Amino acid sequence: MKVRSSVKKICDKCRVIRRKGRVMIICAQPKHKQRQG
């Protein structure tokens, strides 16, 4: 899980979701998991 100020889709399997007011990226590739901190 990468914590970044700006989250971007890395590949076309990345999905932008919102959980508890946080913007997160979930993907089939675990390396691409990010959340906004």
Curated annotation (Swiss-Prot):
SUPFAM superfamilies, sorted: Ribosomal protein L36
Key words, A-Z: Ribonucleoprotein, Ribosomal protein
Gene Ontology biological process terms from the UniProt entry: translation
Pfam families according to UniProt: Ribosomal_L36
Domain of life: Bacteria
InterPro entries: Ribosomal_bL36, Ribosomal_bL36_sp
Keyword Ribosomal protein carried by entry: yes
A GO MF label: structural constituent of ribosome
Ribosomal protein listed as a keyword: yes
GO cellular component, one term: ribonucleoprotein complex
Assigned protein family: Belongs to the bacterial ribosomal protein bL36 family.
Identification of the protein by name: Large ribosomal subunit protein bL36
Species of origin: Mesoplasma florum (strain ATCC 33453 / NBRC 100688 / NCTC 11704 / L1)
